[in-house]
Amino acid sequence: MMYIKNTIQDFVIKFKTNDLNMGEIDFTAEENESSLPVNLNGEIRFFYSHLILNDHPTFYGTFFIQIVESQDLNEILSGWRVQNDTAWHDEYIIFAERNGDVLFCDTRNITSPVYGSIQKRNFIISGSLADFLDVFCSAIEIEQSKYDGDGTDDDFNFREDFLGDIDFMLKGKLKDVEAKGFKQFFFG
């Protein structure tokens, strides 16, 4: 559990370092389980029981996502739980949203593997929530420190060198199929 704890703490730090981010994310060492409306286990349970989330926390920039607050977990899931939908399981927990697409964990596995879903088509992004948080924070670090918070050119297309740097980082941290999923979710 050390790895997930460290990646969550880094996630909070990355959130706080960008003034353009909205809402509030804080880490708490004390387990805060009173407010979990859905059944969680593994890394996603650790995530929600050690984060204080307020005012629709949203990361700004290329890797824009809005984190789902624990009290909203049921509500966001209700739109995805459709009868006779074999592609969607009750064990899927949506933890972030981006323009109507979502990131979710499969709680059937203790590591909480992360998937992206674009127009209800699901694909793997990482073998664990900790791995996702690690690459997400690394991607933000690249965008903020090397590209001054903007990986696009004058025509708002992603810069080739920016995409290359993200690609290189992903190759070092994820399986190829996962890296492809990460890029599909954030770059289309």
Question: Would you name each region that the model predicts?
Answer:
Residues 96-98, 108, 117, 128:
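Structured loops at beta-to-helix junctions and adjacent beta-edge loops in soluble globular domains
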Residues 54, 101, 111, 139-142:
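Short loop/turn segments at secondary-structure transitions that flank enzyme active sites
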Residues 71-80, 111-115, 119, 145-155:
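A short, terminal or domain-edge coil/loop segment
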Residues 113-146:
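Compact, glycine/acidic-enriched structural inserts
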